[in-house]
Amino acid sequence: MSHLRKLRAAAPSVREVALWSRQSPYSRSFSSHNRPSPKYPHHVPLGFFEKGFLAVGSAVGALLNPRRADLIATLGEVTATPYFIYRLRDAMLQDPTGRQILRDRPRITSQTLPLPYLRSLPENSVGRTYATWLDREGVSPDTRDNVQYIDDPECAYVMQRYRECHDFYHAVTGLPTFVEGELALKAFEFLNTLIPMTGLSMAASVRLKPAERERLFSLYLPWAVRSGLNSKELINVYWEKILEKDVDELRAELGIEKPPDMRDIRRMIRLQQKREREQQQGKSS
């Protein structure tokens, strides 16, 4: 266990990985004189080899510590081009709601979606479900990193939109934020969005306990395949405009099957293990 903790602590930061990629003799796509100017706030232009080094470094770091959201975000950006993020953008352009989102470019934060308002909505509404999930998991919409490594400004917004809508996907499916829940959701997202990072995240299943891994592949992966292949493109959901909609009705419209409650399953397993220990102690005494 101490070795694992040391490896997790050694996981590089995004800044360190980016600096390493720029300093490598194989990554000099741009010199200090010809590096393009940023195309939008926070944009960091990188060459092909620089993105390759950044992809490898962030992938290794995220595998060592699956809770490093910054590394996962970086991996998502540098592996989304040249094809996948454009495919997602084109899916939005082909949909009326998607086109409206691209025109409006809304952002999901605690200012644009105040939690007190969301908590005041009807109990089974989308907004109330989202707020309840945020409260239960102890997370905030303000923690999402800004996109940096996608060159096209419109595609950068598409990635930002996907990133900020991720918690809505959690809320609608009911999946929690611990690693097992994140992997189940990532498998669903991969089949819905085709963003490579979501599929690559499944490598983190090696970090699960055997029982968790067996449950992921036997119960939640089949759910992810069914819902991911049959559901509509979630990137085209204008969440801000359907906050009062019934969440069960939304799931039916989108073609999303609600998975078994992961927290309830884990709670029942813990209770069963506790009873078994108590029975063993009773026999031994």
Curated annotation (Swiss-Prot):
Pathway(s) the chain acts in: Cofactor biosynthesis; ubiquinone biosynthesis
Membrane topology type: Peripheral membrane protein
Main subcellular location of this protein, as a coarse class: mitochondrion
Name of a matching Pfam family: Coq4
Keyword Cytoplasm: no
UniProt-listed GO biological process terms: ubiquinone biosynthetic process
UniProt subcellular location: Mitochondrion inner membrane
Binding locations of Zn(2+): H166, D167, H170, E182
Enzyme class label: lyase
CC terms in the record's Gene Ontology section: extrinsic component of mitochondrial inner membrane; mitochondrion
Coiled coil ranges: none
Superkingdom of this protein's organism: Eukaryota
Record's catalysed reaction(s): a 4-hydroxy-3-methoxy-5-(all-trans-polyprenyl)benzoate + H(+) = a 2-methoxy-6-(all-trans-polyprenyl)phenol + CO2
Record keywords: Lyase, Membrane, Metal-binding, Mitochondrion, Mitochondrion inner membrane, Transit peptide, Ubiquinone biosynthesis, Zinc
Enzyme Commission designation: 4.1.1.130
Residues of the transit peptide: 1-37
UniProt function note: Lyase that catalyzes the C1-decarboxylation of 4-hydroxy-3-methoxy-5-(all-trans-polyprenyl)benzoic acid into 2-methoxy-6-(all-trans-polyprenyl)phenol during ubiquinone biosynthesis.
Family indicated by similarity: Belongs to the COQ4 family.
Assembly and interaction partners: Component of a multi-subunit COQ enzyme complex, composed of at least coq3, coq4, coq5, coq6, coq7 and coq9.
Protein name stated in the entry: Ubiquinone biosynthesis protein coq4, mitochondrial
